[in-house]
Amino acid sequence: MSRFFIDRPIFAWVLAIVAMLAGALSLAKMPISQYPNIAAPAVSIQVSYPGASAQTVQDTVVQVIEQQLSGLDGFRYMSAESASDGSMTIIVTFEQGTDPDIAQVQVQNKLQLATPRLPEEVQRQGLRVVKYQMNFFLVMSLVDRSGKLDNFDLGNLIASQLQDPISRIPGVGDFQLFGSPYAMRIWLDPGKLNSYQLTPTDVASAIREQNVQVSSGQLGGLPTRSGVQLNATVLGKTRMTTPSQFDEILVKVNPDGSQVRVKDVGRAELGADSFAISAQYKDSPTASLALRLSTGGNLLETVDAVKKLMEQQKAYLPDGVEVIYPYDTTPVVEASIESVVHTIFEAVVLVFLVMYLFLQSFRATLIPTLAVPVVLLATFALLPYFGLNINVLTMYAMVLAIGLLVDDAIVVVENVERLMHDEGLSPLEATRKSMDQISGALVGIGMVLSAVFVPMAFFGGSAGIIYQQFAITIVVCMGLSILVALVFTPALCVTILKAPEGNSHHERKGFFGWFNRIFDRGTRRFERGVGAMLKGRGRYLLAFLLITGGTGYLFTQIPKAFLPNEDQGLMMIEVRTPANASAERTEGVLQEVRDYLANDEGALVEHFMTVNGFNFAGRGQNSGLVLITFKDWKERHGAGQDVFSIAQRANQHFAKIKDASVMAFVPPAILEMGNAMGFNLYLQDNLGLGHEALMAARNQFLQLASQNPKLQAVRPNGKDDEPQFQVNIDDEKARALQVSIASINETMSAAWGSMYVNDFIDRGRVKRVYVQGEDISRISPEDFDKWYVRNSLGQMVPFSAFATGEWVNGSPKLERYGGISSLNILGEPAPGYSTGDAMIAIAEIMQQLPAGIGLSYTGLSYEEIQTGDQAPLLYALTVLIVFLCLAALYESWSVPVSVIMVVPLGILGAVLATLWRDLTADVYFQVGLMTTVGLSAKNAILIVEFAKELYEKEGYPIVKAAIEAAKLRLRPILMTSLAFTFGVLPMAIASGAGAGSQHSIATGVVGGMITATVLAVFFVPLFYVVVVKLFEGLMKRKPNAVKEVTHEV
């Protein structure tokens, strides 16, 4: 094949240009994201039960739904939480590879079976099933600079004009409105109700009867008599639109003809649908829409679509209202991709300089350099066929591939130049002879290097997705690299290279002459060193065994983790005031946080928004959340300006706040996989010990964790039990007073909860009508005496006649995991420790908890455990596949052994470099380690292959063959190794977005390449001699053993 293109170089150029054009076109169309869909697909079920307690929601809604969620294909785990505001969320997580649309349909079908058993009020509110992602990817806020609109006005703007079109954008999965649409609020006065012998149920019934939309039909509608000349629509009663209309609703007509209207027992007001959540952008009231990405959604395209829509909608917003994005995850995506693109260009330049140093010819150096854009662009053309897009993982893989793909071109160029120098051939003749010699070796080395990464592509879970991005990209690059080396590079050699004027590199003068003389002296010393090692084989084999054992020990000392921490330019602060604290107290703490961010960190903070009434631990008046976006990484390059340092300073400052818990935390490296970095677990009541026992175990866990030096920021992701007022209905007294239990329950729900009645029309949009007691009538337990229920005789009976109250402890939020009562706990490893160390510490703590209390990890921690279980298999499988490929390549079982023995030498450097930089053994480290294994084997192949040829075909003594092979291959080994090392060096010293993952990959690779090169060139000849002698000795003994057995018989 190569000869065809050697004779037709323009044909080769045409193919290369077509490949690059195809790649460029594909590149323009490929979606861009920070990561592929690594997070497992999930579906959430959201339900509201107004006025119900957390326990009521759990007993009547959560467990009913959970019982039906069985038999789901690809089911992984399920979590549920119910809150004291009547809200409930169940999140069903599926295995990687499950189609999220099919998963959603399955959950909806199961939910249909549970719906008839749910309370009527829940069914009237509706059940929402959506594809779910844990973290927000964008928060869009409205701020009124004129000061005319408050939070609820802005919230209604979002709910009425923006929420629906935004939620329909492809990629938007779920949303959280930090604000509220308008609703018609009917505030009831219990004293006036009693004076007219009315109850809240009477008012609600009157509203249902009179606030209706009547379909009245037509005049002259078909069928009709012949001769009818008129057809017209009949308009009947329509739904009401204003508070004054609701005030005039007739509730009761007395026997004397007098009338009681809504305005006589209360008042109608255009208020908020919910008063639970309010937000501020810096010091301005705001309402916000926080968006979650749908499973499989493209982040950049979705955010771009949202912002384009908002640009269109700005013209329809009131004067003075601005659109702001206080929390946006796309800058880190763009910055990460931009950073990797810069790294690729830097890698190409560094590789070019290294090649130029060794090849010492601009023409010769240009040939491998030209191979880089051809291979990379052609790779972009093929990636979509494997389901891959442009993301930081595929880009990282291309950085690794640059050093690998130039290797093949270097081998071709170096061999052509050698033939021109040594045999005086023309470029055409040298290229033809060179390709005849090395075509098989190119394919063989490419096969071995590809074999290193192929096993990674078959692993499952989130780690498997990461492995696949690297494996497929690198294997595609390697395959294309071999094709380019066989097709394009020979054509370039013929057209670009010139026959040398002298006979040797060493005749050069200046810098290159000095370098060659130094290199020659080093080569002679190296040759003597190899000879000395081969004479003292026993000592150096013992040293190798010690190195291998030390490497194994050091490997166990690397802290384990799933992913490295990343500076995403984002931070969150969670605020918790004491149980039963009011929203006003929480707002005071949030104001302290706002002052700190504006004054102490103002130079680094771009946006911040506070939310009162909500955080990731749950809703409630004692909950608060702060979303913070920092300035660009280029403006935060100084010491202490990364998000981790900022979070540490913030926590030190907030620790001074005595009447609240304020915790700053950083999002995880992959935003879709959680809200905070660290570990995520559930304590489970496996034996049904009860809520109090579970809370006691949680408190014991938190106390032990606070004393453990490996753990920090360990906190419950829920709410502490709080005093709650329990109303006890005496059924006997109620029956004696002829009061129905249903009337009691309806009155309680309407008075202290919020009874949804029906809908009204507000400026062309349908909104809700609620009935509730005035705030002054539901402040303290004594206010129960203000409310009455009408008995069957028409008499008004006070609550005190049949009900008593008492204060009890109860939970404002209840959690379940896997259908078992559970409590969620979050935390982080202390500085100097990894999440793997933290999990070991947690296992020790669990041994001290009562029997029946179990532990389950979720989210990122679940993935980390799965990855840890896979890692040993990955390492073993990789080495085995490499060994088998080598055996097939050399048709020998002995030669591969001498190659595989070099692997620990590469791993040693990777381990030492990782420990030196205090990094972790995460997924990226494992990818780098596999790369090191492949490159170590490649270096060994270059020596072993040459030694085998000298020994078996040219009759060299084995020791001399090994020494000669090591000497002759030293220059190309150093050139290719240095080219690869300098190619990944920009990743090892990267800063800014994505620096953590780049460090994790490149540090191990750089360290591994240093030891794999420095030690391997000495040890590989030793391995080859020892292994060949050992196998030859075994083969000689086998015939003798057969003869002895035959003689005895």
UniProtKB/Swiss-Prot annotation:
Major subcellular site? membrane
Q: Where in the cell is it found?
A: Cell inner membrane
Give TM segment ranges.
10-30, 339-359, 366-386, 392-412, 440-460, 470-490, 542-562, 871-891, 895-915, 927-947, 973-993, 1008-1028
Gene Ontology MF, one: xenobiotic transmembrane transporter activity
InterPro entries, per the entry: AcrB_DN_DC_subdom (IPR027463), Acrflvin-R (IPR001036), MdtF-like (IPR004764)
Q: Which GO terms describe its cellular component?
A: plasma membrane
Coiled-coil stretches are none
Membrane topology of the entry? Multi-pass membrane protein
Induction note: Constitutively expressed; the ttgGHI operon is further induced about 4-fold by toluene and styrene but not by antibiotics.
Q: What UniProt keywords are attached to this protein's entry? A: Cell inner membrane, Cell membrane, Membrane, Plasmid, Transmembrane, Transmembrane helix, Transport
Task: Write down a Pfam family by its short name.
Answer: ACR_tran
Say which family it is in: Belongs to the resistance-nodulation-cell division (RND) (TC 2.A.6) family.
Q: Function of this protein? A: The inner membrane transporter component of an organic solvent efflux pump. Involved in export of a number of organic solvents, including toluene and styrene. This is the most important solvent efflux pump in this strain, although it can export AMP and some antibiotics.
What name does UniProt use for this protein? Toluene efflux pump membrane transporter TtgH
What is the originating organism of this protein?
Pseudomonas putida (strain DOT-T1E)
The gene for this chain is: ttgH
